[in-house]
């Protein structure tokens, strides 16, 4: 099943790359040239959307067939003969999912149909007929790599796919970004995260030297000396702290978000940052538990500083996308606080908050980076006022996702934040209390933002416009429904991850 899940996006690449480009320029019999409104890339877009939906539906079968009563890897698949592979690679190309990785796989496959719909207005110029097809294929490559990050059961392969994700991200930001600064933002994204991951590579090589294997199960069963754990932990944590990102390693994130196309922002906030959550769970908490406990006060301090600093900086932002990007830094700080609380509630809360953030943040990027920007072509907050008069449906959804981002009850963010705070309070009451103040600040900037752009007289800087169309509504509605579902029925997630989390910690 997992092999099929990996191959489906590759099938999408093959189909999209072979579609015919429909020239929107028509030459009449009299020699006159007429430009039509036909989208020349419509066929490729429909194929990409269909394949991504099939991939998502197929991933749901994993959710239905998953057995939550065991912490073992399920739906496992091994490539070829193990002994033959070991003579060349010293690692096993095996696939499998457990409760920790299951929902990250489903979240990945869910966000790609959303991303394809969000990119629907992109068109190829006549001088570059392959631009959109290349873009769609790049998204499929990114989906394949992200799925592999969450399902490989070998630490060396995990590192390879973890870093390979940077290549399509670099292309998405650098080629299809929104301004001339996109190339600089793409290089900053690539180099910043790559430099952090070099330390993880050194730790993985040292881990192989000590254990003699890169297989997850073998590493988990091996008793590593505590002092060695600490050295390995530092190298891996630097990479994860850059990817979350934590203060002070966040500067690449808001620049990448500001320049990325809306689909790039959706995927970057929705699932790419969650690789750090999964990597911390798997590599730090599971393989290096003694070192994780030893360094937890330091990590929780960084988490608290990230929450408070990001919330304060967000209050001063004038750019929509940068504001939402900084709010992501704050939420991931709470995730870190729960991860290193050494409690089941905290770790489960961090997973739920990661999933909820992977729904709310993409919705906000869609609303401000696509719905508003496509109409008014500016992300400057001070230009907006009185949108409720002409865009009531947008205003309703923007209000709902703004308060969800602030962590109000019956939303997934609230459940995740409460569990993270409960777990953190047991270990570090001061850190939990300070983080609560950061959550109050997040409510402050959320309410200010909604009030600023929605109410009052309509801004003189803006042209009169229409409300959300059907495509935009179809993108936002599933995100809203799932956000409520996670908030109202968190047991749907907790029941499937409880045994795996308990086994991971104890």
Predicted regions located by residue number:
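C-terminal ends of transmembrane helices
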Residues: 14-35, 113-126, 171-181, 244-258, ...
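Alpha-helical multi-pass transmembrane bundles of energy-transducing inner-membrane proteins
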Residues: 23-25, 29, 39-44, 72, ...
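Predominantly late transmembrane helices and immediately cytosolic-facing juxtamembrane segments
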Residues: 361-365, 430-464
């Amino acid at each position: 099943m997992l092999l099929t899940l990996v191959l489906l996006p590759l099938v999408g690449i093959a189909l999209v790359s072979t579609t015919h480009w429909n020239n929107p320029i028509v030459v009449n019999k009299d020699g006159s040239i007429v430009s039509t409104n036909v989208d020349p890339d419509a066929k490729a877009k429909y194929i990409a959307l269909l394949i991504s939906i099939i991939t998502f539906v197929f991933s749901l079968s994993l959710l239905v067939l998953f057995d939550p009563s065991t912490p073992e890897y399920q739906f496992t698949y091994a490539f070829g003969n193990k002994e033959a592979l070991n003579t060349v690679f010293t690692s096993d190309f095996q696939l499998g999912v457990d409760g920790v990785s299951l929902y990250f796989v489903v979240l990945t496959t869910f966000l790609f149909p959303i991303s394809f719909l969000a990119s629907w207005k992109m068109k190829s110029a006549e001088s570059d007929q392959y631009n959109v097809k290349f873009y769609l294929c790049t998204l499929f490559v990114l989906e394949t790599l992200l799925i592999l990050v969450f399902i490989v059961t070998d630490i060396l392969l995990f590192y390879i796919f973890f870093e390979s994700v940077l290549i399509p991200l670099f292309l998405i930001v650098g080629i299809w970004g929104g301004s001339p600064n996109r190339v600089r933002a793409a290089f900053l994204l690539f180099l910043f995260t790559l430099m952090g991951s070099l330390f993880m590579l050194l730790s993985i090589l040292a881990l192989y030297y000590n254990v003699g294997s890169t297989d997850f199960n073998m590493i988990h069963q091996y008793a590593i000396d505590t002092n060695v754990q600490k050295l390995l932990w530092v190298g891996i944590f630097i990479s994860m702290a850059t990817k979350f990102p934590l203060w002070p390693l966040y500067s690449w994130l808001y620049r990448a978000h500001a320049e990325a196309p809306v689909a790039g922002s959706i995927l970057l906030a929705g699932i790419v940052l969650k690789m750090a959550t999964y990597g911390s769970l798997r590599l730090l908490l599971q393989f290096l538990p003694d070192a994780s406990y030893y360094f937890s006060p330091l990590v929780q301090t960084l988490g608290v500083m990230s929450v408070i600093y990001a919330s304060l900086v967000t209050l001063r932002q004038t750019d929509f996308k940068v504001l939402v990007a900084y709010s992501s830094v704050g939420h991931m700080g709470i995730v870190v606080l729960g991860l290193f609380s050494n409690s089941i509630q905290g770790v489960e809360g961090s997973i739920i908050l990661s999933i909820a953030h992977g729904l709310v943040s993409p919705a906000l990027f869609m609303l401000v980076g696509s719905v508003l920007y496509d109409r008014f072509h500016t992300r400057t907050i001070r230009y907006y006022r009185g949108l409720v008069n002409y865009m009531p449906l947008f205003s309703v959804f923007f209000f709902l996702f703004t308060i969800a981002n602030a962590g109000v009850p019956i939303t997934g963010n609230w459940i995740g934040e409460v569990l993270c705070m409960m777990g953190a309070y047991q270990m570090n009451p001061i850190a939990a209390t300070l983080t609560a103040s950061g959550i109050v600040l997040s409510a402050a900037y959320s309410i200010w933002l909604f009030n600023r752009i929605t109410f009052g007289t309509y801004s003189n800087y803006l042209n009169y416009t229409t409300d959300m169309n059907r495509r935009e509504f179809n993108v936002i509605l599933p995100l809203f429904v799932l956000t409520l579902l996670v908030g109202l029925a968190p047991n749907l997630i907790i029941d499937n991850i409880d045994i795996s989390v308990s086994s991971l910690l104890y």
